[in-house]
Amino acid sequence: MKSPREQAIFARPTRRMMVFVDGENLVFRYQNMVNNGFVPRDEMKHEPDVFVWFDGFTHLGQQHEIIRTTYYTYVVGDDLRVTNIRNQLRSMQFSKHMASLLPNTLSPCVFKKDQRSRSGKGVDIQLSVDMMSHVFRGNVDSILLLSCNGDYAPLLDEVKRAGILVYVSAFSDGFSSSLKDRADAVYELDGTTWK
């Protein structure tokens, strides 16, 4: 007979979570840290100015049933490049609870950007709309935001007012204290990223 602890570990999780990845924010913070001398693990998947990913980025969600992980980003280039990036993201996996039966591949939300600029608002707006939509439709019990952008603080306030648990993960570089203050749990991605 299994101990209560073992039963809890192997039981399918009941709390539903969705993960929202501000890929634009993550990739620029990652690149900044690399430029400052940090050495990434060999397993990191990186396309300059487009995405950075490691399946351990969803570490905080492993005790939840992760329904979906949506990766929001921009691409400069033609439609073929946009499709290629979408396919690359769709082929990547996230870590999940060992008893989960759901698929664990990323759901890409890729915006085409015609000019090379540092950032845009399409990612932030779409991520916010999607998060609020899922929260108010009752699709989730918890959310995990991967971003260090303090602009999401009011969004997290609304999510918490709806009774949803809020988890936030980001690189230490520029990790907004206003996000950390609003999160029920915080995880810095540095430990899973650098050698």
Predicted region positions:
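Nuclease catalytic cores that cleave nucleic-acid phosphodiester bonds
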Residues: 94-195
